[in-house]
Amino acid sequence: SAQDVMRIKYEETFFMNPGPDMPPQMAAQMPKSRKNRKILLATEENSYYFVNKEDPDPEEEHGGNQGRWAMRRQGVDPKVYSDYANEQKLTFTDLFGKEFLIEEGLQPAKWKLHSGEQRDILGYTCIKATQQKDSTTITAWFTPKIAMSIGPDGYYGLPGAILAVSEGESRVYLATLVEQKYTGDAKIEKPTKGTKTTREEFEKIRKEKIEEVRQMNGGQGQRMFIRG
């Protein structure tokens, strides 16, 4: 039925880029990537993407002795709510201790299908699709076997569930578990907390805050990884 809830677990890998202004010895110590685990709960109408607290944190699991690079996320865990029927996306996140609710439209991107290219993920045959986002190529792998137009982190708009996404060289999402009929306690929640803002406004505030911190550090260009 339309109200069946599907649950997909994803692992996100974020590749770290030291940037030109980081001292070489610091860049050498910096880990190449870090991982997060997330859960997507979805129906035909909406979805909720949030931090997976059930499974061990992958950073701690792998020894996690990266000192200050372990990058334990301070503040709140980001949550993304997608309302497919009304094409609305809400992202709850924080920036230097202040909570925000980012409201934006949810337009399915103009995906280009590459039906000749396929790969297997968790036993599901997936088809490749791509889109351009500014200068970045986004590659998604979706399976028509799960006939729901859903995906991680607000990605959707393909004729099937998206089980993997790569954002250029910077981030990869990969499904690690698919439950077609989820019967657990977690619920799809529409976030309401936080100062309401647009994506454009949030990015502007973020840039200003990062510049402030840079100035406080004497202009030392420590690259900061903050993502709403």
What are these regions (language model features)?
Residues 3-228:
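Extended soluble regions of mature proteins
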